[in-house]
Structures are given as C-alpha cells and as structure tokens.
UniProtKB/Swiss-Prot annotation:
UniProt source species: Salmonella typhimurium (strain LT2 / SGSC1412 / ATCC 700720)
Compartments (UniProt record): Cytoplasm
Catalytic activity: L-glutamate + NH4(+) + ATP = L-glutamine + ADP + phosphate + H(+)
Domain of life: Bacteria
Organism phylogeny: Bacteria, Pseudomonadati, Pseudomonadota, Gammaproteobacteria, Enterobacterales
Record's protein name: Glutamine synthetase
Gene name tied to this protein: glnA
Length: 469
C-alpha cells in the first residue's frame, strides 16, 4: 500500500484520526493519535517528531528528539475506537540522518532481513509464531513496603468446582492440564476466540484455527498463517492488541505472561521458521526428517547461541518459571522430528515446500521484532560457520536417566543467566550492523532493573517457608 492509497482510505472511510504506533524495547506497543487532516503526502516523507527520552532504554533528555516515520503499507482501520481511526505502524528514525534508530526494535528486524539478503544465503525468512494466552475473570496484584499479593480467578478454574454461585455452579470446567480441545461448555471461550478471529482477519491476519489450550482457567490459542519476518512481528502486535481488547469487551482480562499460575502449563510462543530463495524452500532436502544441510546448520546456530537468545525470546523473570521440566516446557537443547520434548522440532508436513523447523522455547512476553531477529541471526551464523547440531534425539527427553540428561545442554535457567550469556555472546547479533553494542547494552540494563526488583522483593512463599524460623 502506498501513501497515495492511504490518503484515499482516509476519504473513503471518513477517517477522523490517525493512530501512529511503534514498539518499545520491552515489546509494548505505544501510540500517539493525530487528526486525520494533518496527514498529507509530505507526512510520509517527513514523519512526526516525538520525545524519545520518555521511552525506557532510549534517548537521554539532552538528545530526545526522534522521528516517527509512518510505513504506509501497514495502514489498517482500528476496529475498537469510537471515532473512525486509521492505524499506521512507524519506524523510529534519527532526525539528523533519517536512518533507523539502532535501538528501535522494528528497525532492527528490518536490518536483519536486509542482512539475510546481503549474505546471498536466502532472500526470504518466514516466521509462524504460536502465542498462547490466558483469559481471566479477575486479577488482583500488588507489591509495596507492607506486602505482596496476587489473586487470580476465572469461572473455568479447576479450584472453582465447589464455589457457590448465585445461579448455581454448573461444573463443566477443565481440570489442571485438562484443557486441550474439549468442546463447550467445558471450553467456555469459544465465542470470545471466534470474535478475536473475525477482528484479526478484519485487520489483515489470516487465521487458520483457534482452540482451548492445555491449562485450566482459560488458556487459549489462535493460530495464524506465517509471513515474512518483520511483517509477522507486526502481526503479533496486532494479535496481542486484538486479544486484549476483545477480552475486555467480553468482561475478561487477557495476559501473555508466560507463567501466571503455579502447577499448570505456562504459555509459550513456538516459532516455526524457514528460509527461501527465488521461491524455493532452502530447508527441504535429503537429510534427517527431510531437512537440508543448511537447515541442520541453522539449527546448530540456534542451539549454540540459545542462552543468549533466551534473553530476547524469554525476556522476563516469569519466563523461567515456565522453562522447567514437567510442564511441556522445551528445556533440552536438542532437535527431533515430531518429538515435542525437544527444544527444536521438525513438524510433519504434507509437502517438501512446507518443510520448516519449530523453535519451542520462546514465549509471548518476547518483543517479536527482537526475538525473531535473534533467531534469524543465530541460524545464519550456524549456516555461515557450518555448525552441525549433532545427532537428533528421538526419545522422550523428560524420561532420560540423570546421567544421560546431564549430557544434553539446556536453556538458561534464569533471566540473570540469559542476560549474562547475551553479554558474552553477542557477536553473532552484530553481524552486518543488525544489533549494535549500544542497543544490546541498553537492553541488558533495562532487563537487569526488572531482575533486581524481583530479586530484592520478599515473596509470599518465603513467608511460608521462613516466617517461623
């Protein structure tokens, strides 16, 4: 879509406002809204100035001016605002050079795709992420000097089997780890997910399926079709926006926290990916599980750099409450056909054209632009340096005897470990100027602040364990 087409849309849809959106370092969408009459052809060349010092991990107050540069191809009508509003996604540019800001996640993703093409290895990378989420009826939490608390409730929660409701308790709720694929009334979110699908398609996503997920208390997934990397990261931001707002309309609250509840499955964001050149799938070949040698090297790069990738793909302290054995969490850095206990799976496909790999450790708290770019850069490093991943592991890795299990590397066990790994293993990200040291250092500092706060805050479980010592 061109700027000319956007200007036509403004008239055809009688648009009153234009909502300029961008993504901060942590992955949260931000926006500023302007009257539609301010948008003309020059707007798409000049952009809009804003204060970059107010975004965590970005500019200092002494050099705060930055440019929001609209990408006309992303224009879409907002389905939620009362007044007709057009959303346009923006890149963050330096005002002096009009080059992409080195800490802007979307600019980083675009540089990664440019680097892919510059290597000559491939011209396209396709991503198919699968973010999961919870829908709750009520959530209360807080942390202050006088104490900490969190309380989750949902009518689907297994703990509500004996709860007294005004209209009676109707039962029909999924048990712990019992939520995968039941029909209503056990699956209480059917209509909510259907509405999410309709709105997502209205906003340009292609929906393939939706269903209840494994956990009790409203764990769900909407599956959407793959796309090229930056476009798919854009779509993940739309996906989250739709899930949050449709849930809100239904009187629910949605969360993409990786592990909101102890004792049941957490939410992942498995990432399917493949490389293509001139329309040919480069991951299809005659090696293990129908993969090419390039695909194996790509896997080798992801495994080699996995702990550094964790800092971007599993970016919260909560992420590592999911990455523990026993809850379908892919902690073992191995690859296998069909085997879901491995961190990298090769799905069964109907055609060699669909051959791909699935990296299973990322979670939906990740900034999609940074997560996808890191996975791509690790894979390209594997191809360039011919890093073979070793033999495939086709056995259930959760059932291995301890002496065998300790020989298999694992993902990072904490955010601190992941950030330390990123600090020491960053050169693969800097190839082609995709990530800079400044961007990586700022990211690490931002996440260490969160890690320090969690580490220093007394936890309710500590009172259970230690109050009476």
């Amino acid at each position: 879509m061109s700027a000319e087409h956007v200007l036509t849309m403004l008239n055809e849809h009688e648009v009153k406002f234009v909502d300029l959106r961008f993504t901060d370092t942590k992955g949260k969408e931000q926006h500023v809204t302007i009257p539609a009459h301010q948008v003309n052809a020059e707007f798409f060349e000049e952009g809009k100035m804003f204060d970059g010092s107010s975004i965590g991990g970005w500019k200092g107050i002494n050099e705060s001016d930055m440019v929001l540069m609209p990408d006309a191809s992303t224009a879409v009508i907002d389905p939620f605002f009362a007044d007709s509003t057009l959303i346009i996604r923006c890149d963050i540019l330096e005002p002096g050079t009009l080059q992409g800001y080195d800490r802007d996640p979307r600019s980083i993703a675009k540089r990664a795709e440019d680097y892919l093409r510059a290597t000559g290895i491939a011209d396209t990378v396709l991503f198919g992420p699968e973010p999961e989420f919870f829908l709750f009826d009520d959530i209360r939490f807080g942390a202050s000097i006088s104490g900490s608390h969190v309380a989750i409730d949902d009518i689907e929660g297994a703990w509500n089997s004996s709860t007294k409701y005004e209209g009676g308790n109707k039962g029909h709720r999924p048990g712990v780890k019992g939520g995968y694929f039941p029909v209503p009334p056990v699956d209480s979110a059917q209509d909510i997910r259907s509405e999410m699908c309709l709105v997502m398609e209205q906003m340009g996503l292609v929906v393939e399926a939706h269903h209840h997920e494994v956990a009790t208390a409203g764990q769900n997934e909407v599956a959407t079709r793959f796309n090229t990397m930056t476009k798919k990261a854009d779509e993940i931001q739309i996906y989250k926006y739709v899930v949050h707002n449709v849930a809100h309309r239904f009187g629910k609250t949605a969360t993409f926290m990786p592990k909101p509840m102890f004792g049941d499955n957490g939410s992942g964001m498995h990432c399917h990916m493949s490389l293509a050149k001139n329309g040919t799938n480069l991951f299809s070949g005659d090696k293990y599980a129908g993969l090419s040698e390039q695909a194996l090297y790509y896997i080798g790069g992801v495994i080699k750099h996995a702990k550094a990738i964790n800092a971007l793909a599993n970016p919260t302290t909560n992420s590592y409450k999911r990455l523990v054995p026993g809850y379908e969490a892919p902690v073992m850095l191995a690859y296998s056909a069909r085997n879901r206990s491995a961190s990298i799976r090769i799905p069964v496909v109907a055609s060699p054209k669909a051959r791909r790999i699935e990296v299973r450790f990322p979670d939906p708290a990740a900034n999609p632009y940074l997560c996808f770019a890191a996975l791509l850069m690790a894979g390209l490093d594997g191809i360039k340096n011919k890093i073979h991943p070793g033999e495939a592991m086709d056995k259930n890795l959760y059932d291995l005897p301890p002496e065998e299990a300790k020989e298999i590397p694992q993902v990072a066990g904490s955010l601190e470990e992941a950030l330390n790994a990123l600090d020491l293993d960053r050169e693969f990200l800097k190839a082609g100027g995709v990530f800079t040291d400044e961007a990586i250092d700022a990211y690490i500092a931002l996440r260490r602040e969160e890690d320090d706060r969690v580490r220093m805050t007394p936890h309710p479980v500590e009172f259970e364990l230690y109050y009476s010592v």
